[in-house]
């Protein structure tokens, strides 16, 4: 469903942000 897709994109987005902040990519 669209909602689950948005949730998954949100998780990926947060992961990328945390990666950039922590610089542990």
UniProtKB/Swiss-Prot annotation:
- Keyword Disulfide bond annotated: yes
Check the record and name the InterPro entries matching this protein. Answer: Antimicrobial_frog_2
Indicate what this protein is called per its UniProt record: Ranatuerin-1C
As for subcellular location, the record says: Secreted
The text of the family note is:
Belongs to the frog skin active peptide (FSAP) family. Ranatuerin subfamily.
Q: What tissue specificity does the UniProt entry give?
A: Expressed by the skin glands.
Q: Which GO terms describe its cellular component?
A: extracellular region
Q: Keywords of this protein's UniProt record, alphabetized? A: Amphibian defense peptide, Antibiotic, Antimicrobial, Disulfide bond, Fungicide, Secreted
Spell out the disulfide connections. 19-25
Q: Name one GO biological process term.
A: defense response to fungus
What does this protein's UniProt record list under function? Antibacterial activity against Gram-positive bacterium S.aureus (MIC=55 uM) and Gram-negative bacterium E.coli (MIC=1.5 uM). Has activity against C.albicans (MIC=58 uM).
Q: Which domain of life is it from?
A: Eukaryota
